A protein has these predicted regions:
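Fold-core signature of tandem repeat domains
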Residues: 117, 123-125, 134-136, 142-144, ...
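Acidic (Asp/Glu) and glycine-rich low-complexity loops/linkers
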Residues: 2-10, 20-118, 122-135, 146-150, ...
Length: 257
């Protein structure tokens, strides 16, 4: 399971590093090989995007709707740059991290299939698509109200935070760092968790849970799940019945040969 963690963390590390370096030299940041345009030059026609990339320290608020719309407010909006293609809407700054102030970007679009944050920005969403993923490379955060997912994937490379509620037939969480995934209000039929570092994870399940922990990460599962752990270090997997007294944590230990 740890090889899967490394597979997911590598692209996030490259994304976060590239964004940081672009900001350091004052260069504009590209998303999918494109430089953004000011809002006044953005083409608002065509189908609504299904993916969001936030590559700045700004706040994005998503409202569910089939007709695409985007408005901005707050400080430094003149330096916002927006990328759009047939699937993606991307938010960045003209001068990378040196863009002045903090803006709030309000976007109307269908429940996103993918959310990507490179840096310290934040996203608040009403809902996510039935097949969806959240990817954070840095200290950004995502807060979503609900999801009813067939598959839901979370990848954090850094200290990012995610909080949300809902259900998922299959949940996959990968953390490379000190990320915090608070899905205590989300119930998964099946879950796989891989942590390389001190990340913390919480969710509910009455199904099967597999965890692989290399470090001091902690996974807390509420419900009657069948839990197994493969750990190196002080990390733990704790599975508690919802209304019963706490069960002892499954300690980190060397896997049986």
């Amino acid at each position: 399971m740890m090889h899967r963690l490394f597979k997911h963390m590598a692209p996030l590390a490259v994304l976060a590093l590239g964004t940081a370096l672009s900001g350091c030299d004052g260069a504009d940041i590209e998303i999918n090989g494109q430089k953004g345009v000011p809002l006044a030059e953005l083409d608002m026609s065509g189908p609504a995007p299904t993916e969001l990339v936030l590559s700045s320290g700004d706040e994005v608020i998503l409202t569910e709707g089939q007709t695409f719309d985007l408005t901005v407010e707050g400080e430094g909006t003149d330096s916002l740059r927006i990328v759009r293609d047939d699937k993606l809407i991307g938010i960045t700054r003209k001068d990378g991290w040196n863009g002045e102030g903090k803006a709030t970007i309000r976007i109307t679009m269908p429940p996103p299939e993918e959310l990507v944050i490179a840096g310290s920005g934040s996203v608040k969403a009403q809902s996510l698509a039935s097949t969806s993923s959240i990817n954070i490379g840095g200290s950004g955060s995502v807060d979503f109200a609900s999801v009813a997912a067939k598959t839901f994937e979370v990848n954090i490379g850094g200290s990012g935070k995610i909080k949300g509620a809902g259900t998922a037939e299959r949940l996959e969480i990968n953390i490379g760092g000190s990320g915090d995934v608070d899905l205590a209000a989300l119930k998964a039929d099946r879950a796989e968790v891989a942590i390389g570092g001190s990340g913390d994870v919480a969710f509910a399940s009455d199904g099967t849970v597999e965890a692989s922990i290399a470090g001091a990460g902690d996974v807390k599962v509420t419900g009657n799940a069948k839990c197994t752990v493969n750990a190196f270090g002080s990390g733990t997997l704790t599975c508690n019945p919802a209304a019963d007294s706490p069960a002892p944590a499954l300690p980190a230990e060397e896997p049986a040969e």
